[in-house]
């Protein structure tokens, strides 16, 4: 994750109902423990840090967000989870062109940014939370002091997943949330439409890193990598890719 637009009064609404047990029946009914291990089978390999990411941590974190992976019909739910893991797998990838099992079998290899860009607020966790103001926003929403304790994101796997799902679920005006885009809860404005910003996986890429990857008239290597992971997970979940999976013709939001 490269940049978040500031939020006014960012607040995470965590429902008391539908906690971890509810998510075990919801998200866990699509991403079983066996599926999780198959999706991210190389995360614990030599050279990777990803054994840090566990299925139990994912399910526990998802329990704080009752709408995550549970909105809409079965097809929509599967596509959202494929999209979430597609984007976060790119952010944490350890893959290369000739990697065993292919380049898109190496998601969740990294916990920390390879070359820290803004110490101590460099990229951490599945969404690679970066920069002090993003740690502040996420911490305020989650009830954690991430400004003074940024390493919580790389030392507690539940916190790591919570920051990623929080980002996924949270709109950053004028950007919608990735969740609303993928679950068809977002209606593009006139400006969005004239800028080519339409519902689909490509819009999630635009939200996360549009300034660097979108609106160039061609797909960057990073954008292609995001799509490659997404397609792999859609295939594993037996769901179609949907429309507008690329963002090459989408104008990014101001400042990316």
Swiss-Prot record:
This is Chitinase 11. It catalyses: Random endo-hydrolysis of N-acetyl-beta-D-glucosaminide (1->4)-beta-linkages in chitin and chitodextrins. InterPro entries: Glyco_hydro_19 (IPR016283), Glyco_hydro_19_cat (IPR000726), Lysozyme-like_dom_sf (IPR023346). Belongs to the glycosyl hydrolase 19 family. Chitinase class II subfamily. It comes from the Eukaryota. Pfam families: Glyco_hydro_19. It comes from Oryza sativa subsp. japonica (Rice). Keywords: Carbohydrate metabolism, Disulfide bond, Glycosidase, Hydrolase, Polysaccharide degradation, Signal. PANTHER family: CHITINASE 11, CHITINASE-RELATED. The active site is at 91 (proton donor). Disulfide bonds join 48-109, 214-247. Expressed in leaves and at lower levels in roots, sheaths and meristems. The lineage of its organism: Eukaryota, Viridiplantae, Streptophyta, Embryophyta, Tracheophyta. PROSITE patterns: CHITINASE_19_2 (PS00774). GO terms for biological process: cell wall macromolecule catabolic process; chitin catabolic process; defense response to fungus; polysaccharide catabolic process. One of its GO terms (molecular function) is endochitinase activity.
